[in-house]
Amino acid sequence: MRVNYHQPLLRRNYALGVVNGVVFIAASAFMEPTAVLPAFVLALTGGGKIWVGIVAALITSGWFWPQIFLAGFFSTRRRLLPFYRISSAGRVSAILGIAAVVAFSPHGPHAWVFMAVAGLFFVYASCGAVGMIPFFSIVSDSMPANRRGRFFGLRCLLGGLLAILAGIAVKAILSEQHGLLFPQNYVLLFTIAAVLMAVSAGAFSIVTEPEHNVQRHKLPMPMEVVRGPRLLRRDRNFRLLMWSRAFGAIAAGSSGPFLVPFALEVLKAPQAVVGAFLVVMAAASAGSNLLWSRIGDTQGNRKLLIWSSATAVLPAAIALVSLAVPPAPLGTWFGLPLTLRLAVFSLAFIPLGFAAPGQDIGQTNFLLDIAPERRRSAYLGFSYLVMLPLAWWPVVGALIIGTARFSLAFALGSLAAAAALLTVTRLDEPRADDLGLAEAPAPEPGLQSVPAGG
């Protein structure tokens, strides 16, 4: 076997890791990248969708680039928890910095304000990336493989329930009736997010760090880069996983950051609709986790990736369909005016919230399943190197919207998501022996029966 499926379970770490994830998900809801942040950037810049794409790209690339340079560094360290603590302090400081810049900036769009905010979002994401390998290494060494799906699923389930409450709070804070106008409303959102993230980081900072198998010598960066393509050539599962992630990045970058701008600009929805979308996403996310974690633990992460990828095809497709629906009035929804077109469009946030945890759990655990422990940092680091250029796809999406409006971007997102689905059906399940699965070619998703939820 390539990984130890019988790693002992450290119950203290398991519990603290769940608390960490639950509070982190709640914190993230107050600055959710596909709902809150696009609306914030539109308000900050006066409506420029290219700036929405740039901020989305900076956040994503901030998550990727440190992994490229830190893979070899972490592979020689027996103590990883201090790096997680430092990175968490940086993240909280960056969010507080954003709140301060927005609070004390002059009224109206200003280039320096946008650059400062965008730079701090990049710092926030980069600090998170610094803690990524320590976090996953500690988690992986604290529990057996067949408990990871339940672990991440429980984090997402309970965190999703708190995120529903966060969505209600976001709607109230952004509502005109609340009395807070821009930028004070977003200053409050970012301040709440910073406080909750500090609590989340504090929980994981007191875990008991397990023993790690480390490399005796740090490989030079060129050697890490050379090792990555070799892993990609030799490991079919790794290669297919990276293709699916690439298609998924194109799908997400073409539509994800621009769903809320579409609602605000084309459907003429009020700002408070962001909170309603967030509630829908959080409810779908929380509801999905019982299913995703059970599939991952009992049927394997390959099956999890297939079903979550199938669900991920729907958001952009629904948004595309909504363009053909008439804007007939239907009454109110969450206290907001509702039209038939907005109602159909809002359905896109159900599969968006439903698919995201499955993709996160499946991709993370599948990569941990196929990566031998001593090469784990090389697998993780090179995977981010491959994905780094595609982090800037939201800028391409913004340019497409600027010339052909939203329809072409949503169509491209649907096609790319379908390509990601076809790719994951070709994966082999690395835990097939433990799960009692036959090594057979995967049937098409449409020919499988839907797994029972747990």
Q: Could you describe each region identified by the protein language model?
A:
Residues 75-93, 154, 298-312:
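Cytoplasmic membrane-interface "Motif A"-like loop-to-helix N-cap segments
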Residues 49-50, 145-154, 271-272, 373-383:
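Loop-to-transmembrane helix entry/capping segments in MFS-fold secondary transporters
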Residues 66-79, 174, 288-301, 401:
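Helix-to-loop junctions at the C-terminal end of transmembrane segments
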Residues 89-110, 310-337:
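C-terminal ends and interior cores of transmembrane alpha-helices
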Residues 1-11, 209-243, 441-454:
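Juxtamembrane intracellular "pre-TM" segments in multi-pass secondary transporters
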Residues 128-143, 259, 357-371:
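Intracellular juxtamembrane helix-capping segments at the cytosolic ends
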Residues 37-44, 72-76, 99-108, 162-184, ...:
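Transmembrane alpha-helix termini and helix-breaking/packing motifs in multi-pass membrane transporters
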Residues 1-65, 74, 84, 91, ...:
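Helix-loop boundary and gating motifs at the non-cytosolic
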